[in-house]
A protein has these predicted regions:
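Structured beta-strand-rich core segments of catalytic domains in phosphoester-bond hydrolases
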Residues: 69-160, 269
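Catalytic metal-binding/acid-base residues of hydrolase active sites
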Residues: 40, 76, 167-169, 202-205, ...
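Sec-dependent N-terminal signal peptides
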Residues: 5-13
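Active-site neighborhood of phospho(di)ester-bond hydrolases with catalytic His/Asp-centered motifs
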Residues: 70-73, 95, 197-201, 223-226
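Active-site-proximal beta-strand elements of phosphoester/diester hydrolases
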Residues: 31-43, 107, 120-124, 149, ...
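Metal-dependent phosphoester/phosphodiester hydrolase catalytic core
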Residues: 142-144, 153-181, 190
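N-terminal, active-site-proximal structural segment of metallo-dependent hydrolase catalytic domains
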Residues: 16-86, 97-104, 181, 293
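Metal-dependent phosphoester-hydrolase catalytic domains
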Residues: 151, 174, 178, 185-196, ...
Length: 293
């Protein structure tokens, strides 16, 4: 009986390993994989969905898809440090939104150090407020909100580009609109060469004016969902709570945006779950992209 169990475990491990290798090899050599993932902050009132009950699933999911960059939202410092310990090939940038250090939620940006390096002095977090250089909130925002970004170099190609990660306010419409304008201004200031990606939980659907501010005019932010050369894979929603349900309406509030000189090869929203529950109340969004030479 023990021998049979061990044999089955070995077979499962081999199949899982082969599946992972197929996933890795399916990605084109010069392409870049991006993920945006709201982790849900460690709330002790979440019961069965508390962080300690799902953190291994979150780490396993990220490890399996192995994005070159992933921007997480809502994670507290111990959640970010847990992922840092579990995902050894990654480093990260970001600060707590409450004090600019370790307090409060982070919108940290994680990158694979095997292939990419952060260009010295470019990693930064600003507040989406009228005083962006200090912990603050403005307009009708319920909470402080931040934008974390850095300029990275691909060690294999030498190409340099910016990646931005953010989490917009869940209450203040004016704050969200002004936050969108701040991001556009920051892109225009730093990435005028057109090499950039924007990840985040924007807390708006496509019919909200914030989406129009982001996607219209210059600098252009192209929704990877609509520009994928291959059909979208997975659900059409990114936020519906922990419990798996049927008949969920389209509700994308988490996005990956790309610049004009980028091909989007693939786009997916990942609906993995265990025992009827997702590992977070948001689903991760992933895209495979490639710069146009």
């Amino acid at each position: 009986m023990i021998k049979t169990g061990l044999t089955l475990l070995l077979l499962v491990s081999i199949v899982a390993g082969c599946a992972h290798e197929r996933h890795q090899s399916a990605q084109q050599e010069d392409s870049i994989s991006l993920m945006s993932y709201n982790l849900r902050f460690d709330n002790p009132n979440d019961g069965i969905n508390a962080w300690d009950n799902r953190k291994e699933h979150v780490a396993a999911l990220i490890r399996f898809y192995a994005p070159d960059f992933f921007g997480q939202q809502e994670g507290l410092i111990h959640q970010v440090e847990y992922l840092d310990d579990e995902l050894e090939e990654y480093d990260w940038i970001g600060v707590g939104r409450d004090d600019g250090d370790r307090a409060g939620e982070l919108s940290s940006l994680h990158y694979n150090t095997v292939r990419f390096e952060l260009i010295e002095g470019t990693g930064q977090t600003i507040w989406l407020s009228e005083t962006p250089d200090e912990p603050s909130r403005s307009w009708d925002a319920a909470l402080p909100r931040v934008l974390t970004f850095g300029k990275f170099r691909d060690k294999t190609t030498g190409r340099e580009f910016y990646v931005f990660n953010t989490h917009f306010d869940h209450i203040g419409q004016t704050a969200r609109e002004e936050s969108a304008r701040i991001i556009k201004q920051k892109i225009e200031e730093l990435a005028s060469d057109g090499n950039y990606f924007v990840l985040g939980d924007f807390n708006v659907r496509e019919d909200n004016p914030v989406y129009e501010i982001l996607t219209m005019g210059n600098p252009p932010l192209r929704d990877a969902f609509y520009h994928s050369e291959n059909p979208h894979v997975g659900p059409l929603f990114t936020f519906e709570g922990f419990e798996v349900k049927s008949g969920v309406e389209q509700r994308r509030i988490d996005y990956i945006f790309v610049s004009e000189n980028v091909r989007v090869l693939n786009h997916a929203i990942l609906g993995h779950f265990r025992n009827g529950y997702y590992p977070s109340d948001h689903l991760p969004v992933i895209a495979e992209v490639m710069f146009v030479e």
